[in-house]
Swiss-Prot record:
One of its GO terms (cellular component) is membrane. Keywords: Membrane, Transmembrane, Transmembrane helix. The gene is C3orf18. This is Uncharacterized protein C3orf18. PANTHER family: SIMILAR TO RIKEN CDNA 6430571L13 GENE, SIMILAR TO G20 PROTEIN, SIMILAR TO RIKEN CDNA 6430571L13 GENE_ SIMILAR TO G20 PROTEIN. It comes from Homo sapiens (Human). Residues 1-49 are annotated as: Disordered. It comes from the Eukaryota. It is a single-pass membrane protein.
């Protein structure tokens, strides 16, 4: 049991185990004797101020570790950015698989169609006014043949307000 306590005490304490006889004051000699200790013997503090060369090495080590952490962080951010970009590209392809949209081309077609629609409406009005002057009336189904056009935003707005 004592060997277990001594070994446990050795693990948990940095001091060697002491017995009670070590704790009692020594009374071998006369009590009037004094011992003088030199300053070197009483100094237990072994801490020294680091020299300048050791300080720059510590700063270099700190900067190196900071640099490594920064590079790892940038690499992780780059990987996440690439994954996000691929995911958005995949989603875009899923949403419009067979459709290639070019807004400039679409705008040109829309403008051309609006111009043609305006000309068609003007020609219908002119034909109606000419027929009214001549005294002939036509039903809308007998009017000039118009080519079917796409539904445009103005047509939708006019239909809503009508």
């Amino acid at each position: 049991m004592n060997s277990r306590t001594a070994s446990a005490r050795g693990w948990f304490s940095s001091r060697p185990p002491t017995s009670e006889s070590d704790l009692e004051p020594a009374t071998d000699g006369p009590a009037s004797e004094t011992t003088t200790l030199s300053p070197e013997a009483t100094t237990f503090n072994d801490t020294r101020i680091p020299d300048a060369a050791g300080g720059t090495a510590g700063v270099g080590t700190m900067l190196l570790s900071f640099g490594i952490i920064t590079v790892i962080g940038l690499a992780v951010a780059l990987v996440l950015y690439i994954r996000k970009k691929k995911r958005l590209e995949k989603l875009r392809h899923q949403l419009m698989p067979m459709y290639n949209f070019d807004p400039t081309e679409e705008q040109d077609e829309l403008e051309q169609e609006l111009l043609e629609h305006g000309r068609d409406a003007a020609s219908v009005q002119a034909a109606t006014s000419v027929q009214a002057m001549q005294g002939k009336t036509t039903l809308p189904s007998q009017g000039p043949l118009q080519r079917p056009s796409r539904l445009v935003f103005t047509d939708v707005a006019n239909a809503i307000h009508a």
